[in-house]
Amino acid sequence: MYVNRRFYDKYVSTRDVELLHEYSLRVLKEVGVSFDCEEALEIFKKHGATVEGSIVKIDEDLLNQALETAPKTFTITTSAGETKIGERYKPKTVGCYGPPKFLFEDDEYRVAKKDDMVKFLKLMDTSDVTDFVNNSAYDTPDLDKTKEDFYLPQVAMCLKYSQKPTYGNVANSMNVRGKSLKQEAKDIAKLYKEFYDIWDRPVLLTNTCALSPLGYSYEVLDNIMGLVEEGQPVTIITCSMTNLTAPAALLGSVIQNNATILAGIVLTQLINPGNPVIYGTVSTATDMRNVACSIGAPEAQLIQMASLALGRYYQLPVRTGIAGTDSLKPDYQAGVESFMILMTTYLGKSDFVLNHAGILQAYALGSYEKFVLDEEVNRILLRLNRGIDISDVKAEKVFDAIKKAGPLGNYLSGRTPKEYRQEHWLTKLFNRQAGNPQPIFDEIGDLRERASKEVEERVAGYTLPDLTKTQKDILNRYLPEDEKF
């Protein structure tokens, strides 16, 4: 079981959470949330919500009914096994998500292409701190966009390159034509069920983002309804910006986000009671000097910690935290900001994190080097969360060791003790060598150089999953021509 440090308790009290909940209820009942979808509006009407045009107002009773059916934990099942998500389990992770451009090893910014996305899939597949895979870039310029549906070919790439479960994105009206997005979402779910030959359980998890302030677009709603009808879990998130799409006060951002997320969760439970859903937010600050989304701001951590406390109050699985930075390069700023925001995931203890590695410039850039550097940050935070192993038995043992060494003695004798190996994290990329700095630097090089070398070694050592003929035949119906088996 993962130790839950509940770091959010240092930010918000139980009374604070109750106040946030109280005003969220008022927003739901008195202000409402916009749903740009007739089918969703009819579902709310049928279950007694107040519907005024596209605005849905939800009372406390309807909210509580939905929260009663939403599960505390759930499991994603694939042919490789089970991935459990919930408060008692280690946070689950997935990498760089959807930036249009990458920072490449030659220090140039370029539009990502399909092979660049595949390289990220290989890094995610070979990562010991990455649980899911996803498309790190979408709708790349080298895809065949004459097809009515060039989204499913991208989805199929995740199944080709990894046996880890997939964290999906919503289809949109740009990459799917000729059918509804709801049908596309159902088709994606059916592809995964057929590929795994698992028909009665969740087989993938999908990210769905509200439209702040207090709204859901028809595209997102179509995807939510299609996936939930197929029994597949969704993450409902907000990504609001203070003083732009959320109030200037952090308190207002948390209240508005909470009301928005809860409204989406209610819809999932009205469609399919008991369907797994994750309560999530990556809402953040706005730098009003240039009206920019600032995902590495300390206010982002504060907003997400408070939202994490609310998710725990509702006893729902929670998604918060990112290796988020506004930096343009994997530099000092990137490390500081990524560590700070990822604290929400590992020490606040949320249950899922998207963009746990590899993102730059407020989601606009991906970086292979930052991915492997962020892996080290994830490992450090995992180690910090374990804490110190303190027990009567261990105390007696270390006292004997202290007594044996005595004053001015030492502990360096024989083989490295088991306790050292168990309790110390040893970095793969960061420098810990001591001595004359110049020869050390000449030997190991700059940190980015070491990261780049790690990337190339990982990609070179990658091997495709061993798929069955049936699985290959299924994927060949969808994969881009140059990716078929």
Curated annotation (Swiss-Prot):
Its EC number is 2.1.1.-. Coiled coil: none annotated. Keywords: Methyltransferase, Transferase. It comes from the Bacteria. It is an enzyme of class 2 (transferase). It holds the Pfam family MTTB. One of its GO terms (molecular function) is methyltransferase activity. One of its GO terms (biological process) is methylation. InterPro entries: MttB-like_sf, MTTB_MeTrfase. It catalyses: Co(I)-[quaternary-amine-specific corrinoid protein] + L-proline betaine + H(+) = methyl-Co(III)-[quaternary-amine-specific corrinoid protein] + N-methyl-L-proline. Induction: Up-regulated during growth on proline betaine. Involved in the degradation of the quaternary amine L-proline betaine. Component of a corrinoid-dependent methyltransferase system that transfers a methyl group from L-proline betaine to tetrahydrofolate (THF), forming methyl-THF, a key intermediate in the Wood-Ljungdahl acetogenesis pathway. MtpB catalyzes the methylation of the corrinoid protein MtqC, using L-proline betaine as the methyl donor. Shows weak activity with some other quaternary amines, including carnitine, phosphocholine, glycine betaine or betonicine, but cannot methylate free cob(I)alamin. Belongs to the trimethylamine methyltransferase family. The proline betaine:THF methyl transfer system is composed of two methyltransferases, MtpB and MtqA, and the corrinoid protein MtqC. This is Proline betaine:corrinoid methyltransferase. It comes from Eubacterium limosum. The lineage of its organism: Bacteria, Bacillati, Bacillota, Clostridia, Eubacteriales. The gene is mtpB.
